[in-house]
Amino acid sequence: MSFEISVEEIDELIETGNLNIDYALKELGATSQPPPNRPLSQISKTEENNDETRTSKNSASAEAPAHASSPLRSHNEESEPGKQSSDGFSMISNRPQTGMLLMGSDTQSPSPSKTYQGLILDAKKRALNEPRRNQKTTNEHGNTNDTWIFKRGEYSHQERGLGYTESEIKNTIFIPRHRREHSISWVNGRTTISEWCNPCCAPVKSIASVEKCTCGRCPKICELCIRDP
C-alpha cells in the first residue's frame, strides 16, 4: 500500500482549502482574493496617500492634549471668584445664580465659630425655656385624653392644673412618704417577687429589709401599701 500523493492530489487539496477559506471570509464580510494588479505609478500614489494619512493621524494625536486642556482652563477660570462664562451661568460660582437646578433651599447653617458643645448648650436652653403645651391624644376607643409634657423643675400638681399658685407651691412643706421596694428571688425552682413599703427617711440597702421611720413624720400606711398583707 502506497502513501505517496501525486502533484494533482496536492493541487486539489490546496484548492479545496482555498475554497473553504474564501467561504469563511465571505461569511465574515471579507475576501481572500488578492487585489488586482495595478501599475507601479498607482501603487506609489497609494503608498504616498497612506503615508500622508499616517502623518495626519500622528499630528492629530499630538494636538489632542492641547485641545483637551482647553476645557480645563475654562473650568478653572469659572471657578475663580468674580468670573463667569459668556452666557452668565456657570456650574461653579461663589454666589448662587438664578436658574440653578442643583441649588437647595436657603437654610441657615450654624455659625462655624460655635463648637459642638456650644450647639448642645443652645439646644438645651431652647428645650428648657420654650413654653410647654398640653397635647391631646385619641385612644383606640375614640376618647380624647389630655397628656402633659414633662419639664425639668416644674411641679407635677402645677403641670396637671390643680389650681395651685406659685407662692403656694414655694411655701409647701415637704411631707415624707413611703418608698416602694421590690425583691426578686429564686425559691424552689420558681421566681418569687416580693414588694413592700419603707419610709423615705430609711436608708436604701442592697439586702431586702423592712425599715422603720427615723424622723417620726412618715405615715404608717400609704396608698401603695394599704392593700399589702
Curated annotation (Swiss-Prot):
Keywords: Host-virus interaction, Inhibition of host innate immune response by virus, Inhibition of host interferon signaling pathway by virus, Inhibition of host MDA5 by virus, Inhibition of host RLR pathway by virus, Inhibition of host STAT1 by virus, Interferon antiviral system evasion, Metal-binding, Viral immunoevasion, Zinc. Residues 45-55 have a biased composition (Basic and acidic residues). It comes from the Viruses. GO terms for molecular function: metal ion binding. Residues 59-71 have a biased composition (Low complexity). The keyword Zinc applies. Residues 82-97, 105-115 have a biased composition (Polar residues). Zn(2+) 2 binds at residues 201, 213, 215, 218. Zn(2+) 1 binds at residues 178, 197, 222, 225. Residues 28-115 are annotated as: Disordered. InterPro entries: Paramyx_V_Zn-bd. GO terms for biological process: symbiont-mediated suppression of host cytoplasmic pattern recognition receptor signaling pathway via inhibition of MDA-5 activity; symbiont-mediated suppression of host JAK-STAT cascade via inhibition of STAT1 activity; symbiont-mediated suppression of host type I interferon-mediated signaling pathway. The keyword Metal-binding applies. Belongs to the paramyxoviruses V protein family. Blocks host interferon signaling. This is Non-structural protein V. It comes from Human parainfluenza 4b virus (strain 68-333) (HPIV-4b). The lineage of its organism: Viruses, Riboviria, Orthornavirae, Negarnaviricota, Haploviricotina.
